[in-house]
Amino acid sequence: MTDAEFNAAIERMIQGDRSGLRDVYDAYGNTIYRLFLGLVHRHQDAEDLTSEFFLKLWGCASTYRAGTGHKCWMNAIARNMAVDFQRKNREIPMEDAAEVYAEQQTSAETAEDEVIGAMHTNQILSRLSEDDREIVQLHLSAELTFREIASILKRPLGTVAWKYRTAIGKLQKLAEEGQLV
């Protein structure tokens, strides 16, 4: 979705037209879900947060300033929601593979593949510090640029790019040593 399309969708939302929200959801629903899944590590919580996110987006559409980067704005909202969620739920247990598989039994094979892929990705990323993992997830899952990530995290651009390269280097080294399955 381009900035112009997003701006038009926001304008429709402000006027009470749900089609604007539907367009934003269609364009970013999966991306926001993957971002939450990477941050909270539980499928049910990620789904709940995704629903809450779009309700919140509907309510705060009028606060968006055109030209400020809609992806950055949405990801800042999502990240803040995940941080608030984690504060309220300090103890966040990881789901085991059997539970995840059982939850996804009714879904199509592609959904099962997506769950397994997400579990594998989370397992791999768990080898990184929380700080590095967040940067990698924002860049790869949320498809944000380093500049957008720096803005969200309120860190220098060079630091974000360096931490990303260092994290990817660590993962490559672990893969070469056969420590990543």
Regions found by a protein language model. Name each.
Residues 27-30, 38-41, 137-144, 154:
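Short helix-capping/turn signature of helix-turn-helix
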Residues 79, 83, 132, 141, ...:
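DNA-recognition helix of helix-turn-helix
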Residues 62-66, 76-96:
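Arg/Lys-rich amphipathic alpha helix in sigma70-family domain 2
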Residues 1-31, 38, 126, 180-181:
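N-terminal module of bacterial RNA polymerase sigma factors
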Residues 24, 28, 32, 53, ...:
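Residue-level preference for hydrophobic side chains embedded in well-ordered alpha helices
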Residues 14-15, 41, 52-69, 88-89:
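Sigma70-family region 2
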Residues 34, 48-55, 59, 68-80:
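Structural recognition of an alpha-helix C-terminal capping motif at a helix-to-coil junction
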Residues 2-6, 84, 91-121:
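Internal acidic/polar
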